[in-house]
């Protein structure tokens, strides 16, 4: 019913430097979400974003003072109704590229309050491994701080580059999540 009233602007921030399982996951999600939503993709691995220096100047200037892709990227994120984060597991955490984008959101963090969000994580260990829990907890903390409505957190096990393409159950689940 919500879709009949208003199209949602969904922002998918996905890091898939290898163009493998995370890309497959977000493609399945998008397939479900495409009807009735405007979807944009942010690909951190293709952006030039310097690490946050913690200088605090952004609080005076209402944006990052770095002359890179930060402010344009954060503008996109702030304008979204829903943000979907998708990442491979790197050393028990999200990818450095995604973390860097999230860190740079500090410059406009309060404008992210109340967003609908979702999380898709793909790793090379079974989904009961601690690595997924650590990432979920980090996103839970962000969601709590920013009053996010965390709609879903999904983890998938895929070791070889195209493993997720063979997992029809996971692809169907992601498509169904996207269509909600």
Q: What is each stretch, according to the model?
A:
Residues 1-13:
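Single conserved hydrophobic/aromatic residue that forms the stacking wall/gate
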Residues 13-15, 44, 121-124:
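Cofactor-binding loop segments of dinucleotide-utilizing enzymes, especially the Rossmann-like FAD-
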Residues 23-27, 132-140, 171:
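Short, surface-exposed alpha-helical segments at coil->helix boundaries
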Residues 28-37:
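A short, Lys/Arg-enriched amphipathic alpha-helix followed by its capping loop at the start of a domain
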Residues 33, 140-180:
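Glycine-rich phosphate/pyrophosphate-binding loop and the adjoining helix
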Residues 37-48:
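A short beta-strand-loop structural module common to alpha/beta enzyme folds
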Residues 47-77:
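Cysteine-cluster motifs in flexible loop/terminal segments that predominantly coordinate metals
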Residues 65-146:
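Helix-loop-strand module that forms the ligand-binding subsite of alpha/beta enzymes
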